[in-house]
Structures are given as structure tokens and as C-alpha cells.
């Protein structure tokens, strides 16, 4: 009851990930059913896969609220100034073919643009490929992100891309050191996107 929903014409964060659990009360206030899509027509739009362990829902919450610590220790209202859109680009089982990553991402962006053509939005690509180390060289996926962000100079888009993950094979005490030693994952090397990495000790 303390969350004030965003206005209907508010800008959106469009999360490209494993979907989102719209039934969650903190998500439903900002995610309309028509703004929840899946790249593949036979996929469920919900974040239902055990394989991804709710990653899309977690990223949705983070995109909407950020750090909720002040709200948890207080009793004031929280006004949301942006909406949420989610497009499921990860299958519930298995993986997409790497050669399709660029196409899937472009199709997801197009779906969001078509669904609400006049809405301003930021795209959050919350998944990466942990395959070969590209050492910053462009790939078809990163090049497509660059192309979508530039938009021929007219229909430009703001893309936030995950830097990737540190392997759980390393002991926790080495985590910060490994961040300095590890390369970002594909397509975070895109030039026209903002690459974001984060850590919390909460």
C-alpha cells in the first residue's frame, strides 16, 4: 500500500532476460500484462524456469526500486517514476543458439517499440554470453547492440548491458580481485551501450 504506481505515460525500463513474475505485488504495480512479452511465440512470458532461478524477476525489481533499504526501515510512501516492460529472451529449458543472439535481441527491441511506439524507454540487457573471451573485439551481438543504440542517428536508444558474472569457482575472498582480472562478457564490449557491473554486501 506504500507504493504509488507510475503514471500511464511514464517512461519505462525494458528488461531483456528470463521474463518476470508479474504476480509479485512489487512488480505488478508497474508491469501491465500487455507490456510482458516473450521473443518466441510458444514461450510463457512469466519467469518460470528453474534454470535461470528468477533472474529476470530479480532484475525487474532492481530496475524498478534499486536499494530498498531506506523503505524497509521507514514507513513513508514510495513513488515510482517509471514503468516496467519485460521481454523474455531466454528459454525455460536449454539455451538459444549463439548465432541467434543478435537477431533475438533485435526482435525483442522491435517488439517493445511496436507494443508502445510513443513510450520513452531504456533497455536493460541483463544477460551475457560466457563463451570465448573476445578481448573486447566486436561480435555480431555487440555490433547489433551498437546498431540498435545508434538507430541511424534518428531513433537512438539507451542500452544498459550487464558486464557479466564472476565464476563461482573462485573463493569469495577473491571476488573483488577477480573483478579486476576478468574480462567483460559478450556483448558488454559494445561501444554505444553503457556496461554496468555491480556488487552488494547486503
Residue ranges and their predicted role:
Residues 55, 163, 196:
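Short glycine-rich loop/turn motifs that provide flexible caps or phosphate-binding loops at active sites
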Residues 23-25, 170-171, 196-198:
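Short helix/loop capping segments that flank catalytic or ligand/cofactor-binding pockets
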Residues 87-89, 196:
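Hydrophobic residues at beta-strand termini and immediately following loops
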Residues 90-190, 200:
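Substrate-binding/access-modulating region of protease and related hydrolase catalytic domains
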Residues 2-86, 113-126, 155-156:
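Active-site core segment of subtilase-fold serine proteases
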Amino acid at each position: 500500500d506504500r507504493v504509488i504506481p507510475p503514471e500511464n505515460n511514464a517512461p519505462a525500463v525494458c528488461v531483456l532476460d528470463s521474463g518476470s513474475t508479474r504476480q509479485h505485488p512489487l512488480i505488478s504495480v508497474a508491469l501491465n500484462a500487455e507490456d510482458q512479452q516473450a521473443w518466441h511465440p510458444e514461450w510463457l512470458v512469466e519467469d518460470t524456469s528453474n534454470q535461470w532461478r528468477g533472474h529476470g524477476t530479480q532484475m525487474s525489481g532492481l530496475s524498478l526500486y534499486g536499494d530498498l533499504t531506506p523503505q524497509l526501515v521507514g514507513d513513508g510512501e514510495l513513488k515510482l517514476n517509471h514503468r516496467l516492460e519485460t521481454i523474455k529472451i531466454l528459454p525455460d529449458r536449454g539455451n538459444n543458439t549463439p548465432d541467434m543472439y543478435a537477431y533475438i535481441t533485435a526482435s525483442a527491441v522491435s517488439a517493445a517499440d511496436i507494443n508502445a511506439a510513443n513510450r520513452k524507454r531504456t533497455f536493460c540487457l541483463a544477460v551475457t554470453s560466457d563463451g570465448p573471451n573476445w578481448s573486447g573485439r566486436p561480435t555480431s551481438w555487440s555490433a547489433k547492440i551498437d546498431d540498435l543504440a545508434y538507430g541511424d542517428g534518428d531513433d537512438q536508444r539507451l542500452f544498459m548491458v550487464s558486464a557479466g558474472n564472476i565464476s563461482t569457482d573462485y573463493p569469495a575472498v577473491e571476488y573483488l580481485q577477480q573483478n579486476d582480472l576478468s574480462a567483460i562478457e559478450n556483448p558488454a564490449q559494445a561501444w554505444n551501450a553503457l556496461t554496468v557491473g555491480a556488487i552488494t554486501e547486503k
